[in-house]
């Protein structure tokens, strides 16, 4: 019985590893979504900068404009538990914390990390000029 349980657990771990590699995880899916819609997103941001109105992406994800020293337009793509994933447009091409929260950013492995009150924290890195990936946990 123990041997069958061990084989089952090992098999499930292999299946999980294969699906993780093939699917690439949440981060890769968010980046692929950005890349797939990059031209459309660029058009939306050009229109937003001209009119001040967000149009288009609301049908397929949560889009919010956050004012601040450096404005941002945040596209929240998905969430898992208390962690949110997405990307944002920074007209000034500067990295920002989730929801444009005024907290300091510190350099991290390939981007910047931030920490706010309690266990609120996140991570961001640049995808291309004016565009950044983010993860935020609350």
Residue ranges: model-predicted function:
Residues 1-15:
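N-terminal Sec-pathway targeting helices
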């Amino acid at each position: 019985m123990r041997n069958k349980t061990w084989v089952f657990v090992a098999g499930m771990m292999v299946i999980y590893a294969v699906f993780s590699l093939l699917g690439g995880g949440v981060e890769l899916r968010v980046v692929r979504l950005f890349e797939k819609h990059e031209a459309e997103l660029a058009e939306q941001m050009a229109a937003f900068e001209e009119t001040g109105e967000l149009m288009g992406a609301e049908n397929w994800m949560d889009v919010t404009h956050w004012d601040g020293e450096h404005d941002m337009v945040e596209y929240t793509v998905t969430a898992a538990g208390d962690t949110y994933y997405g990307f944002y447009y920074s007209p000034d091409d500067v990295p920002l914390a989730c929801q444009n929260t005024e907290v300091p950013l510190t350099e991290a492995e390939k981007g910047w990390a931030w920490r706010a009150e309690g266990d609120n924290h996140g991570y961001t890195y640049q995808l291309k000029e004016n565009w950044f990936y983010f993860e935020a946990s609350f």
